Amino acid sequence: MANWKKITRRSFLVLGAVVAGGAAFGAYKVAEVPENPLRPGPEGTPLNPWVIINADGVTVIAPRAEMGQGISTTLAALVAEELDVDWQQVRVMHGPPAQAYFNAGMAEAASNRPNYQVASEPKSHSALLAALPKIFSLQMTGGSSGTLDGFEKMRLAGAGAREALKAAAARRLGVDAQGLKTEGGKVIGAQSFTYAELAEEAAALVPAEVALRDPSTWRYLGKAMPRLDMEAKSTGTATFGIDTYLPGMKFASVRMNPRRGGAMKGHDPAAALQVPGVEQVIDLGNGIAVVATNTWSAIQGAEAVTVDWDVADYPADSAAMTAVIEAAFTDDPDSRLRDDG
């Protein structure tokens, strides 16, 4: 049996053995269970920080940024495996900024050790590594850490939601929850209930302890799954940070010396200022930035600026670079590692 709170308590015990004095407050912060940042609303009823139930199915909160690596689909599959929902019932949303979404796997990934070695470490070691990301709410993506962080955490979220929904159905039917089963987004007994019908009541019944499914029963994990973001990215309906628009928002495009490290002697912004939408050309010292009312105008304006670039302090082509490197070698040994014995 396991739960997210138990993992948190484990972190407290590990740190409690090695801290003293003022650092004890840090140990307390590690043991503290982060608040659920989600609230009931139009999106549905949250059962924990990662699972929202609504009439359309289940929305999984993926706290790692989707950058083409497929992490949103992976995290959703971890939840769906325990929650007993059909794949077409699953949606994914990116998590809001919140401590609950700290990335405990980042510290493990930063060790540059193979994942199989990280996975074989004692739980106490993993808890210690997770301490800093939790204290500082490091909700970051990178280092192939998303699955390291979420493999147990997301399954616990799905299992906890499943058992809460069963408890809600059992209360309505006046039976033991152990006699009920879940399948296809429903709790099934003498009477069946959809998850949406039970969500509001289940939100107050999330258990402290849940058992994770045996891998032999997995339907999704370890198998090829259709990516949840495939259709939106194929049809151009996916939204990204660059799609954000705010009242009075401006856009900028930066142009720097194409020779890395090279300076700028001067520039003429006249042509750029004639581009519709361009409002200003800013001298950055070693480059320029064009501010406009939209992205396209900013890009076109930056290309229209006449710039006198200075040369860089390195050779201009590969052949010249190779010549410099070759000239650095000498025929005589000029270093010594050891001189003994």
Model regions: which residues?
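Structural alpha/beta core scaffold segments of enzyme domains
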Residues: 1-341
